[in-house]
Amino acid sequence: GGELIQGVLASSAQHDLAIEHMDVTAARKRWPQFAFDDDMEVIFEQRAGFLLVEHAISAHIEKAQWAGAELFLGHTIGEVKTGGSCLEVITDKETFTADSVVVTAGAWAADLLPELNGQLRILKKPLHWYAADADLYSNRAGCPAFFFESETGGYYGFPSIDERGLKVARHSGGIEITNPLELDRSLDVQERGCVAGFLRKHLPQVSDQATDHTVCMYTVSADSYFIIDHAQADERIVYAAGLSGHGFKFASALGELLAKMASGESHGYDLTPFSAGRR
């Protein structure tokens, strides 16, 4: 198995994940809508799935407001000022003071945390939807979310849940950008071609007619592992950055961890592997 298979097996052993490890013959019988190479190994994680992101964000906001949080939307943050008895978060509309600050700024992390300059790359990542037979590739038909590790890179997808069809994207690759405010959201023909080639080989019954596309950004650390730490400028600032395309699924756990770090509570985790100064 490749790096992906070995990583899943190691995680399964460490965290007691419910998985089925099968050869390609068994996988072909179970999921005939996928075309597996003869030398592939397949793992099915029974409790895995996918998130409805906008619904999840709304739920987080609702729960936070219920707990007393105030939302200030539409502010552009200029800096988090240190040196005083309180930290100051300076925006284009007003200044907030706080005993501690959590920074989860994604592609803008290095703008607020100078120690991250040169440690992060921002990648433009196109996402694509394709027309697909609902009897084969829909969530209601039992089509699983999937990730293929192939000779041309890693590709993932989610079953169809609406009229847009099957969602597919390339996890590897990407187009490096320097300014997230100038992100070009137009279709990249080369990236579309890579995804189309993957579909022809491994999901041949999916239409090559794309129904939609959008663009997101990965903020990638040097080793593709999260950076979770206190800021060098002031220990009262805690942050998570460089989530490398995996951040949202960990949002609940990261939020709880960062809140405990900011308030000085014990969290019980060894964060050495995620420190900004790791080697």
Set out the residue ranges of the language-model regions.
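Dinucleotide-binding Rossmann-like beta1-alpha1 core, especially the glycine-rich loop
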Residues: 1-30, 154-155
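Short glycine-/acidic-enriched loop or helix-start segments at secondary-structure transitions
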Residues: 5, 31, 82, 112-114, ...
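Active-site catalytic microenvironments for nucleophilic, acid-base chemistry
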Residues: 63, 108-111, 115, 257, ...
